[in-house]
């Protein structure tokens, strides 16, 4: 009976082939008609080439070229010392190399392959059909491939690419993308690394639980620092606002006092001038009247003296009243003008203070690299003002701000500031 089967080679198998007319594969009994020494064996090297006459063990041309080498299968070749080639077309070319499987190739010293058409180079291990590894690599799985040195590919079609030395690809179709790396997928196939313990050293991986704790800790610290910075900023802003308001009030009061002093001086001057003018006018009129009366009285006879005196008294009285009335009217007019000017001055001072309060309500930008737009209102007594402004914080230490306030009519106030902190 003839059957196709897979065969494992060992010292026990070799002994069985010499000592028994029977061999077993997959628990089926196989009969050998003979076991013969190949004519290709070197008689001086004590090498045995197994070429059983039974078809189940392969065909002809098995070749073992060195001592302790074994070749089993049609065209199997074991080229170096202690090399083993098992399977049709299998090749073991290196010292201590092992090639098991049809068309498998162990192409360097200590290379090991297991699987159809698998290939391993020096010190490499390839397990699985069509598995391939370069020097000092390990490829496990169908069509797994290691093209870099000292690397490992485990899984169906897993691949360590050229120049990706010292890398590992684990899992179906996993691929590496750099040196000294471990890949468990590829660009379009990502996998999770589960049941990972928390890292303890700087070079350990971090699991999600550790990451969450660090994020929470960082958030707490960030909130604490933000609160501290905000408190400092608010305190600074409050102090500066109070200082600015106090300065504005002081300046307004100084301006008001100056204006009042000027108004008083002007009023006194006008009143003095008016009084002097009235007095001069009255004296002049009185002198003219008296002169006329004297002339008139002198021209009359003495019997008309009493009449002249009476007439003179009446005339002088009327002239004096007229002069006083004109003087009072002029003085009243000047004082009304002064009152109007003072009222306008009070209004302008109130509007100025309202504008200053509105400008002081504008916020300074806090975020670095941020531009803000802010608006505010202010009032003083019966006056109100609207202010708008904008600012920009260049960095943590430098900020710019400008604003404009409008209190009605043509009353506009503006300011601009530059802030440096250290």
Swiss-Prot record:
A Pfam family recorded for this sequence: YadA_anchor
Major place of localization?
other
MF-aspect GO terms: collagen binding
Annotated stretches, region: Surface exposed passenger domain = 26-330
Q: Name one GO cellular component term.
A: cell outer membrane
Localization in the cell: Cell surface; Cell outer membrane
- Where does the chain cross the membrane? 369-379, 383-394, 401-407, 411-422
- Residue ranges of the region described as Translocator domain: 369-422
Q: Which residues form a coiled coil?
A: 206-236
The secretion signal range is 1-25
**Domain of life the protein comes from:** Bacteria
Would you kindly state one Gene Ontology biological process term found in this protein's UniProt entry? protein transport
The UniProt keywords, alphabetically, are:
Cell adhesion, Cell outer membrane, Coiled coil, Membrane, Plasmid, Protein transport, Signal, Transmembrane, Transmembrane beta strand, Transport, Virulence
Chain positions covered by the region annotation Outer membrane translocation of the passenger domain = 331-368
User: Any extra detail in the entry?
Assistant: Expression of mutant proteins in E.coli is improved in a degP deletion, suggesting the mutants are susceptible to degradation in the periplasm.
* Domain remark from Swiss-Prot or TrEMBL: The signal peptide, cleaved at the inner membrane, guides the autotransporter protein to the periplasmic space. Then, insertion of the trimerized C-terminal translocator domain in the outer membrane forms a hydrophilic pore for the translocation of the passenger domain to the bacterial cell surface. The passenger domain is probably exported as a hairpin structure, with all 3 strands of the trimer in the pore simultaneously.
Q: Which family does it belong to?
A: Belongs to the autotransporter-2 (AT-2) (TC 1.B.40) family.
Subunit: Homotrimer; trimers are very stable, not disrupted by heating at 95 degrees Celsius for 10 minutes in SDS sample buffer.
Sum up the protein's function in the record's words.
Collagen-binding outer membrane protein forming a fibrillar matrix on the bacterial cell surface and phagocytosis resistance. Promotes initial attachment and invasion of eukaryotic cells. Also protects the bacteria by being responsible for agglutination, serum resistance and complement inactivation. Gly-389 plays an important role in this protein; replacing it with increasingly large polar residues decreases expression levels and trimer stability.
Protein name (record): Adhesin YadA
Annotated organism of origin: Yersinia enterocolitica serotype O:8 / biotype 1B (strain NCTC 13174 / 8081)
